[in-house]
Regions:
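Structural recognition of the beta-strand scaffold that forms the well-ordered cores
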Residues: 36-38, 131, 181
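Generic beta-sheet signal
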Residues: 82, 133, 182-183
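Short loop/turn motifs at secondary-structure junctions
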Residues: 33, 126, 148-151
Length: 250
């Protein structure tokens, strides 16, 4: 199983879903060998709700609904619903959860601290996973991470900060958490630039996905972050392409 645990399908927080571009992005991800994408769009994006509804309810991308928040496209690519939550005090957490759980979250940026977010998800019931995103990139450190970090499912190694890999590895070891790879791409170029691989023995059927199965693989330390050759270049190219898309949409 090859999956990118951190994927955006909107080019910016103010952009509307461009369904033609989204379909192209998903097709490119599959052609690049990915089996699954965890859609962690910014929860505070203006059109987050439109994207969530369009992908997982209205099925604008043409897939088979396997479970709430899980689609299998005709190409075989799996999509799982999620959100990137910007925390109070700085930093971001990836929440992997069904759409009904995501819709109950307060969308305002900085509304939750990490402990509050974890408490809300726990109280809401259902299967969820929370991943600390790009904590060593810029000012993305999460202040409460040393205190509640062990309650998370994983630490992310992001494609845009591969030079800090050793820091992420040490943090994951200190918190006794697995390390996952996330592309954090807003365009098709960056998706999968860093991704997560789980062996066939642990995940024998790459045509199915569930948060419970992902969490189980993470708990067993069966996930491995993998950066593709030229990942840094893909990140730079994606940044340029994204700027062009934003200019065209203005």
């Amino acid at each position: 199983m090859k999956l990118d645990t951190h994927v955006h399908l909107l080019i910016s927080k103010t952009a509307r879903p461009d369904w033609d571009e989204i379909r192209f992005t998903l097709d490119a991800a599959r052609r690049n060998g990915l089996d699954a994408l965890c859609i962690c769009e910014h929860l505070d994006a203006v059109h987050y709700a439109d994207l969530l509804e369009g992908v997982f309810d209205a099925n604008r991308v043409g897939g088979e609904r396997l479970a709430p928040g899980v689609l299998r496209l005709e190409s075989g690519l799996l999509l799982s619903s999620g959100a990137e939550v910007s925390l109070r005090g700085g930093g971001d957490a990836g929440v992997h959860a069904p759409p009904d759980v995501l819709r109950r979250l307060e969308r305002q940026k900085g509304f939750y601290s990490l402990p509050e977010l974890l408490d809300v998800l726990k109280a809401g019931g259902g299967e969820t996973a929370v991943v600390a995103h790009h904590v060593y990139f810029g000012r993305k450190w999460i202040d409460e991470l040393p205190v509640v970090g062990k309650q998370l499912s994983a630490i992310e190694l992001p494609a845009k900060d591969l030079a800090s890999r050793e820091k992420y590895e040490l943090l994951a070891a200190r918190l006794e958490l697995p390390l996952v790879g996330g592309g954090d791409g807003h365009t098709w170029l960056q998706i999968g630039a860093c991704h997560t691989e789980i062996g066939e023995a642990e995940w024998p059927d790459a045509s199915v996905f569930s948060i419970a199965r992902l969490k189980d693989a993470l708990k067993r330390y069966r996930a491995e972050p993998v950066a593709v050759a030229g990942a840094d270049r893909l990140v730079r190219m994606s940044r340029i392409y994204r700027q062009r898309l934003e200019q065209a949409a203005a």
